[in-house]
Amino acid sequence: MNYHKITYPDLENGLGVRITIWVSGCMHQCKGCHNPETWPIQSGKPFTSETIQELCNLLDKYDYLDGVTFSGGDPFHPLNVGTVTRLCKLLKSRYPHKNIWLYTGFTYEWLIRRPIYAQALEYIDVL
């Protein structure tokens, strides 16, 4: 998975003070999108173990952070969903008091009928 940036503190992409991960890749390409630069799946930079450590360091250091938001791009792009699911699972196990928001162009009804997405939804508080 690639991402464009990590924003913190972020007050605009969910309730409270958050960290927002702006992932690359979107098949929807909605008219009026605020982030068309994130549409190409290969844009941005690789999301690595160092990126995960940076994210965890922020959550460890700043207790006032309410949670993590995934935006983009589309975190549920078929090439992103595996990494996003693993990361959400890690965050929920390590930071159970933090909430996870995820913005996607897919509907809930479409997602729950597909096992790979339904599994990811187990770790997401707000879709």
Positions of PLM-derived features:
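Conserved Radical SAM active-site core
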Residues: 1-3, 17, 35-102, 106-117
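N-terminal pre-triad scaffold of radical SAM enzymes
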Residues: 2-29
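Receiver (REC) domain switch/active-site residues of two-component response regulators
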Residues: 125-126
